[in-house]
C-alpha cells in the first residue's frame, strides 16, 4: 500500500502480535497516530510463527510484526513494510536491565556494564552486514541481506543508542505505553525505580 496512512487500519483486518509488550506498543503507536485500537478488526492468530503463516496464507489486510519478519515478507513478495511503530512512538525504555540495589553495587554488575557498553558501541559502529553475520544463527529462515537491512533500519532509528542509562523521557514514554494498555495502574516515579548504571 504505497499510499498507506494509519487511519486505513480502522475497519481493516489486522493480524496483531498479542504478546504483552508488542501488543502494548502497537496499541499505543496506533493511538499516537490518531486511530483507536478498538476500530481495528484485530486478529489473534497465535504465535509469531503462526501470525506469519496466516498472513502468507491470505489472512488479514495488515500484519503487525517485529523485525526482521516484516522485512522478510517484503523480500518474499508477500507484502510491503508500510509503517513503523517505533517511529510512531519514539524512544522508549522497554528493553531494560533490572537488578537489586545490592547487585548494582557489586563488582559483577560493573563487569557486566563494561561488557554491555562495549556491545552497545559495537552495534552502533559496526556495519549492518557484520552484525547480521554474527546474529544470523538466531534468525533461521531470514535472508542475510534482509537481516542486515533490518539492523540498518534499527541503527538509524536509534534503537541501540550508545548511552546505557535510562533517560527520564524514554522511561516516561514506557509508562505511557503500559498505562494505555492497562498493563500498569499507576505511574511509578522515575527516581524510585531507575538508578544510574554502575561505573564500568
Task: Give the label of every model feature segment.
Residues 42, 49-138:
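Pocket-lining segment of extracytoplasmic ligand-binding domains
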Residues 105-183:
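Secondary-structure end/capping motifs
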Residues 1-75, 168-173:
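Bilobed "Venus flytrap"/periplasmic-binding protein-like clamshell domains
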